[in-house]
């Protein structure tokens, strides 16, 4: 019976640690950039968009497709960083579960 109680306590402790890491991740910011850094976007760790910034050189009414492509590049870059950080932080808990 004691083993089960210890396992439950350890699981609860790990859950609290994981919740704190998730909160830390959500409070973090990740900035993605396009080629030549003409477009930058910033997301929180819980994938909320904070900002999109465009350099003047990329804003051309005659070539809206380039602006769209660079925006997509920057967004995908930032979200990839969020995913990598999430895997790294949450993956650390996988081997610590007592069951």
Swiss-Prot record:
One of its GO terms (molecular function) is DNA binding. Residues 1-10 have a biased composition (Low complexity). Residues 1-20 are annotated as: Disordered. It is found in: Cytoplasm, Nucleoid. Keywords: Cytoplasm, DNA-binding. One of its GO terms (cellular component) is bacterial nucleoid. NCBIfam families: DNA_YbaB_EbfC. Homodimer. PANTHER family: NUCLEOID-ASSOCIATED PROTEIN YBAB (PTHR33449:SF1). This is Nucleoid-associated protein SAG1747. It comes from Streptococcus agalactiae serotype V (strain ATCC BAA-611 / 2603 V/R).
